[in-house]
Regions:
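Intrinsically disordered, low-complexity Ser/Thr/Pro/Gly-rich regulatory segments
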Residues: 30, 48-327
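Extended alpha-helical segments
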Residues: 1-52
Length: 327
């Protein structure tokens, strides 16, 4: 009898212990269910915005003040034995609104990178993600929330919620329309580069001939197909900029080989990376003979590079007014 009672007590205690061990998992599961239900209910309203605003085209396109005749660049490539197979039209979806978003991302990348990478990791599934920001600095929290707010306003996020102290969490779910996937998986970085170039061309009031050739699909002299990111010229100088938001290891050597094929005193090749410290970039530059830049230093570098072409600097007040009109 005593043995039987002990057995029952042990069984009861075991069940209680199992219950206690599973409390946290149950709570977490309930939180996930509640979040999912909130997202589903919220999307019924928010998806109406998506239909109306998925392709907001601004009348002040970033290229309006730039001569986009790329003949000089194309002639240079042909002289190097390169065949231009296809040049896509400028993407009308990447308008001033998205250029402004790309500029925000590029100029504040170190502050938003954790949230950006969390969003990017959910683009294939569209699932919600909870981001714990307890270890973020106040600046990182502020910029991350601003970033998510901007994405949400543009319907790039299906759902966004910020939980203040003591939780300090962001809960979000990305929108999976092609525009969003294309932009956030990497095209934002190209857009950032183009936007910064255009901004400085206006700032320095450059009167030299300026042109762009974006994403041309080419055939190299050895028959290999290749696609370049950004080519732009100022006067006789051509700048070639490749950009990578993730794994760069398989590309550096390829870019280096293409740079050797295109080698000229008028060609300036660069590789822009987001996840690599400048010290490592310097080592890659020395190893592959192609200037490698970290995103944190890109704006300053570009400023110094284009300053040599300045006619005169537009007064700061006029510059700010112009930017405000384009945003």
């Amino acid at each position: 009898m005593i043995d039987e009672d002990i057995s029952k007590i042990a069984e009861t205690l075991s069940k209680e212990e199992f219950k206690l061990n599973n409390d946290e998992r149950i709570i977490n599961a309930l939180e996930r269910i509640a979040t999912s239900l909130e997202i589903i209910a919220h999307n019924k309203i928010h998806n109406t915005k998506l239909k109306n605003n998925a392709n907001p085209i601004s009348s002040n396109n970033v290229f309006n003040s730039i001569n986009n005749d790329s003949q000089y660049i194309e002639n240079f490539l042909m002289k190097k034995g390169v065949t231009i197979k296809f040049v896509p039209e400028i993407n009308s979806e990447i308008n001033d609104v998205l250029y402004s978003l790309a500029s925000f991302m590029g100029n504040n990348y170190s502050k938003i990178s954790s949230v950006y990478k969390a969003i990017k990791s959910r683009l294939s599934s569209g699932e919600s993600v909870k981001i714990d920001m307890k270890n973020f600095t106040q600046e990182e929290i502020s910029y991350s929330c601003q970033f998510c707010h901007n994405l949400y306003e543009l319907t790039f996020l299906d759902y966004y919620k910020y939980l203040k102290s003591p939780k300090y969490q962001i809960i979000l779910a990305p929108n999976r329309i092609p525009l969003v996937i294309n932009f956030l998986t990497g095209h934002w970085l190209e857009s950032y580069v183009v936007y910064e170039i255009k901004k400085l061309i206006n700032y320095f009031n450059i009167k030299k001939e300026v042109s762009f050739l974006l994403n041309p699909q080419i055939c190299l002299p050895n028959g290999d197909d290749f696609e370049l990111d950004i080519l732009f010229s100022v006067d006789d100088n051509i700048y070639w900029i490749e950009s990578k938001t993730s794994d760069y290891h398989h590309y550096v050597e390829k870019y280096s080989k293409v740079a050797k094929i295109l080698n000229s005193e008028n060609l300036h090749p660069y590789l822009l990376l987001t996840e690599v410290p400048q010290q490592t970039c310097n080592k890659l530059t020395n190893l592959f003979g192609m200037k490698v830049l970290n995103i944190e230093n890109f704006s300053e570098f570009l400023f110094r590079e284009l300053e040599q072409y300045k006619t005169h600097i537009i007064p700061e007040e006029a510059y700010n007014v112009e930017n405000n009109e384009n945003e």
